[in-house]
């Protein structure tokens, strides 16, 4: 099926909503199963464990609040919960994406072919196995780019006052941008677009990508919904690629 998508770019909210629609398209659902299973097993188990630990972690986190901010404790407590969910959710979604990266790339490729009518390269299990080293190298590039920035932000959490007020906001913005990079990279990588060039392309539509990443980050924190977010985000990011980036960067048409 050739896509009814237009070349006019939409908001990141639109593409996130499209992800929920596209994930259930006939012919696409079978490529959703493996990423979905990885996400359900890892995120489901991780968040179950997290919720058993919150009553220990949150008081520890709040102990860093200085005396002069104690009067704001009733506001800072929910902010602390959100902070833990943000950091924890992003960490485990990163692990899930590492494990499911070859299948996410295949999902993006098949959806792009369906949306555009283009013919992708040979796929299948042997095609996936052949591409695994390249895909893992790409995931490593993302991790190396992300890690030092994440460490700086995590250090901010241990600064009294800043860690309970400014750091959660900065982490949310950072995770929104990183999740946009994570999911938009699958269609870019399918066309062998270098990692640096991909980031430059995303910056040309930074607001759209931040909107998409912010919604993905929020849904990653919500129990049950976060079990389905990986294939949904891959589909939404692929729709964005088709509308906004494919004409300039596509390797196969």
Curated annotation (Swiss-Prot):
GO terms for biological process: cysteine biosynthetic process; sulfate assimilation. GO terms for cellular component: plasma membrane. It comes from the Bacteria. Belongs to the CysZ family. High affinity, high specificity proton-dependent sulfate transporter, which mediates sulfate uptake. Provides the sulfur source for the cysteine synthesis pathway. The keyword Cell membrane applies. It is found in: Cell inner membrane. GO terms for molecular function: high-affinity sulfate:proton symporter activity. HAMAP family: CysZ. Pfam families: EI24 (PF07264). This is Sulfate transporter CysZ. It is a multi-pass membrane protein. The chain crosses the membrane at residues 31-51, 75-95, 151-171, 222-242. The keyword Acyltransferase does not apply. Keywords: Amino-acid biosynthesis, Cell inner membrane, Cell membrane, Cysteine biosynthesis, Membrane, Sulfate transport, Transmembrane, Transmembrane helix, Transport.
């Amino acid at each position: 099926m050739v896509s009814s998508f237009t070349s006019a770019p939409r908001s990141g909210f639109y593409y996130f909503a499209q992800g929920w629609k596209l994930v259930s398209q006939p012919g696409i659902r079978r490529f959703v199963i493996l990423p979905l299973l990885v996400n359900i097993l890892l995120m489901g188990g991780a968040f179950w464990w997290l919720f058993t630990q919150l009553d220990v972690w949150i008081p520890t986190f709040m102990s860093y609040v200085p005396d002069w901010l104690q009067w704001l404790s009733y506001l800072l407590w929910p902010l602390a919960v959100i902070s833990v969910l943000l950091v924890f959710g992003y960490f485990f979604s990163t692990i899930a994406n590492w494990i499911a990266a070859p299948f996410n790339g295949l999902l993006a490729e098949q959806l792009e072919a369906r949306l555009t009518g283009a013919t992708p390269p040979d796929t299948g299990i042997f095609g996936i196995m052949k591409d695994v080293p390249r895909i893992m190298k790409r995931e490593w590039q993302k991790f190396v780019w992300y890690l030092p920035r994440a460490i700086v932000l995590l250090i901010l959490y241990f600064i009294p006052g800043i860690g309970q007020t400014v750091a959660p906001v900065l982490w949310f913005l950072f995770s929104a941008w990183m999740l946009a990079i994570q999911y938009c990279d699958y269609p870019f990588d399918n066309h062998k677009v270098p990692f640096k060039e991909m980031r430059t392309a995303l910056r040309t539509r930074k607001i759209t990508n931040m909107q998409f990443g912010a919604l993905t980050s929020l849904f990653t924190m919500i129990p049950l919904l976060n079990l389905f977010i990986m294939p949904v985000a891959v589909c939404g990011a692929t729709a964005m690629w088709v509308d906004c980036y494919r004409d300039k960067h596509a390797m196969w048409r």
